[in-house]
């Protein structure tokens, strides 16, 4: 790594961290890449799951974190679940959702296919795949046209409402019915329930985020919460259900190429000065590369060295052949993991790693 750094500079090095480690490990890994390699080319698996959600949340509410824990469902009157199958993928969260439904909360479950959680739903919504934006915009249309929004909350906390009104004007449920496959009357019914409930919360998974229009999907959900005032109170909020056990913590800790810990931009000079003072060295002033861009750069001989901790891009990358070609072209690859992964076959150096039960904290 030092030879590459001295010969080519930090831009020819990168790191791929883990969403399965602790917050402290995520923080230390991104700090190591930024401090030792002198680059912001550090990422983790959020790029393959909820990066679109983080982008929309940063844009919409100023933070890439969930605005409420899944335990908030216990206080909710209306729970909306879309693009997720909590019983299979988030069983603890699913328990809270089912208990809330049993206590009388309205449960709206959106999915192109039937799922087990629909047994508890007051309103199961089966729609055509890929039509999320059309369906969600029709909900926004109903809420705005029927004046079900929270005008006081909008005046105090929301920008761009009039622009949103114009955007969704042509997305009536009647026009969208053929596209989404959901009847106009049904859309109006569950839109009214979501808007009129005192406390509504939205949960979504990678069925929302893993799309070419994933950010737009998330924007629609954020808009639904904001215009109805269902953010910032107990039993309300926005909760993207993460893919691995600590994607949220790793993101919060700065394991992302464009932000430091707490989602502070690497291009903000005041923020950068703060971290330079704390870490005792000058830092890269430019955004780093995402793992997708990193793989392309490696194939094009623009990155020579990579440190992978607790990740397995040889298996997790959507284009495995491309990822494996990239890994094979690296001049130096270090892999740190609890297991001998497919990625480790390409490594020049393999470091051990502790599994969760082996850690003291």
What is each residue range found by the language model?
Residues 1-359:
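Catalytic alpha/large subunits of respiratory electron-transfer oxidoreductases
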């Amino acid at each position: 790594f030092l030879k590459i750094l001295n010969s080519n500079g930090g831009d020819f090095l990168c790191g791929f961290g883990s969403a399965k480690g602790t917050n402290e490990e995520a923080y230390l890994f991104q700090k190591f890449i930024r401090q030792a390699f002198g680059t912001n080319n550090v990422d983790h698996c959020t790029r393959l799951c909820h990066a679109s959600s983080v982008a929309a949340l940063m844009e919409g509410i100023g933070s890439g974190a969930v605005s409420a824990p899944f335990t908030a469902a216990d206080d909710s009157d209306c729970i909306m679940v879309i693009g997720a199958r909590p019983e299979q993928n988030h069983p603890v969260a699913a328990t809270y959702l089912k208990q809330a439904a049993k206590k009388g909360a309205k449960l709206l479950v959106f999915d192109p296919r039937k799922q087990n959680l629909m047994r508890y739903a007051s309103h199961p919504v089966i729609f055509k795949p890929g039509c999320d934006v059309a369906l969600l915009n029709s909900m926004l249309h109903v809420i705005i046209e029927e004046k079900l929004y929270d005008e006081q909350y909008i005046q105090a906390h929301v920008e761009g409402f009039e622009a949103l009104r114009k955007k969704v004007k042509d997305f009536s449920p009647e026009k969208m019915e053929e596209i989404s496959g959901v009847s106009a009357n049904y859309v109006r019914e569950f839109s009214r329930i979501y808007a009129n409930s005192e406390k509504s919360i939205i949960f979504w998974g990678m069925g929302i985020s893993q799309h070419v229009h994933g950010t737009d999907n998330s924007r629609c959900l954020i808009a639904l919460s904001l215009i109805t005032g269902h953010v910032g109170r107990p039993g309300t909020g926005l909760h993207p259900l993460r893919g691995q056990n600590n994607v949220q913590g790793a993101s919060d800790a700065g394991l992302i190429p464009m932000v430091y810990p707490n989602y502070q931009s690497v291009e903000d000079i005041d923020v950068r000065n703060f971290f330079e003072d704390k870490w005792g060295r000058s830092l890269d002033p430019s955004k780093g590369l995402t793992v997708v861009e990193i793989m392309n750069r490696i194939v094009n001989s623009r990155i020579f060295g990579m440190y992978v901790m607790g990740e397995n891009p040889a298996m997790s990358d959507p284009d495995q052949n491309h990822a494996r070609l990239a890994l094979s072209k690296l001049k130096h690859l270090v892999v740190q993991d609890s297991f001998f992964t497919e990625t480790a076959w390409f490594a020049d150096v393999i470091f051990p790693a502790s599994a969760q039960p082996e850690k003291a904290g």
